[in-house]
A protein has these predicted regions:
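Conserved GNAT acetyl-CoA-binding A-motif
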Residues: 96-108
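Residue-level recognition of the GNAT/N-acetyltransferase active site
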Residues: 76, 109
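Short acidic/polar active-site loop segments enriched in Thr and Asp
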Residues: 66, 102, 122
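Conserved acetyl-CoA-binding loop-helix of GNAT-fold acetyltransferases
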Residues: 81-94
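A conserved beta-strand-loop-helix scaffold within acyl/acetyltransferase catalytic domains
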Residues: 34-74
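Conserved acetyl-CoA-binding loop of GNAT-fold acetyltransferases
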Residues: 117-127
Length: 127
């Protein structure tokens, strides 16, 4: 439950065990065997912690230029509906801009549209 111990951390490089625990709780299945190759190539990744426990995560992949992509936004079900995902995405947006991303993209399932609109995302047409 959110309280004064929830901390949003930029580029925390969580352990594979911490990521696997969160991945299983949030997605219902195992994640990649190792997250290191993913995280070391990210423009930024952001974690939410309750003390030492990783309870939320978002990753931003990029093309090495001006386009970046929000991926894997998740929060442990015991901590959902407290604004943690909004804080994760907001930090990811802020750091992505500071690191040179001019375009930040996200693909999502239809039931997440309201959430991503609340984060400031909207549809764009390819030119």
């Amino acid at each position: 439950m959110e309280g004064p111990l929830i901390e949003i951390v930029t580029d925390p490089f969580p352990s594979d065990d911490a990521m696997q625990r969160l991945w299983l709780a949030a997605w219902g299945g195992a994640g990649p065997t190792s997250f290191e190759p993913i995280l070391t190539r990210s423009l930024v990744h952001v974690g939410a912690y309750d003390g030492a426990l990783l309870i939320g995560f978002v990753n931003v992949a990029w093309d090495g230029g001006i386009h970046a992509f929000i991926l894997d936004t998740c929060v442990d079900p015991d901590y959902r509906r407290q604004g943690i995902a909004l804080k994760l995405v907001a930090r990811a947006q802020e750091v992505s801009r500071a690191r040179g991303a001019l375009w930040l993209h996200v693909d999502f399932e239809p039931h997440l549209e309201a959430f991503y609109r609340q984060c400031g995302f909207g549809p764009t047409a390819a030119a």
